[in-house]
Every structure is written in structure tokens, then in C-alpha cells.
Amino acid sequence: MKNIKKINICEVCDNSELLSVLDMGDLPLCDDLIPKNSKKICREYPTEILFCNNCYTAHHKYQVDKELLFPKSYHYRARFTADVLNGMKELVGSLIKNDGSIKGKLVLDIGCNDGSLLNEFKKNGAITIGVEPTGAYKEAENNKHKIINDYLSYEVAKNIVKDHGKMDIITFTNVFAHIDDLKSLIKSLRELIKSTTIIIIENHYLGSVLISNQFDTFYHEHPRTYSYNSFKHI
């Protein structure tokens, strides 16, 4: 099928013996929202989950192109959800409590959306940079953050370092699991970090998904669901 990549090997540890554990049939993209009176029909994509019993990572067998998942017209905005905003404020507060002042620190938020998290960093004196491929980047720019309107890649990472230097803090708030090319992501991170860089990853956890039967988190925007063991391999 066009615009789909089929996974046969674990993208974390390269194990070729993946077990099919859940098939939910064909489902539409969760953010493909259509007006009530529109005659357009949502396109559906196969939703089958593969499990790696070596590193304990769950994969979507069929991964949809990122341009379809996160187009310029992407609807989601972080600022519309009070719990999300409160969580961002708590994240920055916890960072300051544990590691001290962030005044003058270079902060990079990957998938910064409308800049809500960057706003919290900026309030506390940080120098704020974001990477955001969707139209939400304009709202972040309006709040005086430096925004790269693109998907994260090695070339984007090199340009960020060229323009600003190595990062002090890098954040992924419910974004790490959205990035399809894991090897490219890790290569990009290696370019962006120095020995003292703090990387913050907020992510749903495979253990909780299994214990609480959170199968509704297996949608196409999450090509992988990670366990603690996944990150040990990464």
C-alpha cells in the first residue's frame, strides 16, 4: 500500500523474530478529522502490533508516512488542554528544583507544537528553540521562540548546532514515540548534545499499557511503544 512502510525487524535491537500480538484491522488516522457534512471518507490503514521479546518493544507492523500523520494542517494544540499545560509547568519546575537555574540555558523542544512548553522555559530565562513540522509552528514563532519548521533530521540538527551551539536541555513531550526513523533520531541527538546535556523524554510506557489494557494507545502516530528495556538497548 502506498505511503506505508512494513516493519519486519525490530528498530531498536535488530531482532528479526517479531511476534504478532494484536491485530485491530483497518483504522483511520486519529487526527484525520472531517467536517460533519463533508462527503470525504477517512482513509483506513492496517493496525497490527508486533512485539520484540529481546528488547521488549512493541511496533506497528505498518507505519504510515509522517507527512500524512503530521501535515501542515495538523489540528492538535497543546494550549487547549489544561492538564497538558499544568504538566509542562510542573516539568520545568521540577527541572529547576533538581538542577538549578535555567537562565541563559539553550533549550530545544522537539515537536514543540504551539510553543506551550517553550513558554514555560522562556518565563524562567531560558533561550528557546523548537522544531515543529506542522502549521502550529506559527503560533510558537508569535511567542518569540526560534522555530525550525521541519521534521527533525541530522541536517536540521547540524544547522541548529551551527547557529546556536550544543544544547543544554532537549525535551520530547509525547513526541519521542511519534518519530518513525529511530536511527536517524539517535544520530541527530548525538549531534545536538554535549556531555552535560539533559534530555527529557515524556512517553507512554509499555508496562502500563499491558497492565491497564491501554490498547487504545496503539494508533498510527505511535510507530513504537517503549519499555524500560527498550531504552537500555537504545
Model-derived features with residue positions:
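Short, glycine-/aromatic-enriched active-site segment of Class I SAM-dependent methyltransferases
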Residues: 32, 201-224, 228-232
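Conserved class I S-adenosyl-L-methionine
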Residues: 103-113
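Class I SAM-dependent methyltransferase SAM/SAH-binding core
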Residues: 116-155
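Short amphipathic alpha-helix with an adjacent loop that forms part of the alpha/beta core around
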Residues: 155-165
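A short glycine-rich, Lys/Arg-flanked "PGG" loop and its adjoining helix->strand segment in the class I
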Residues: 183-198
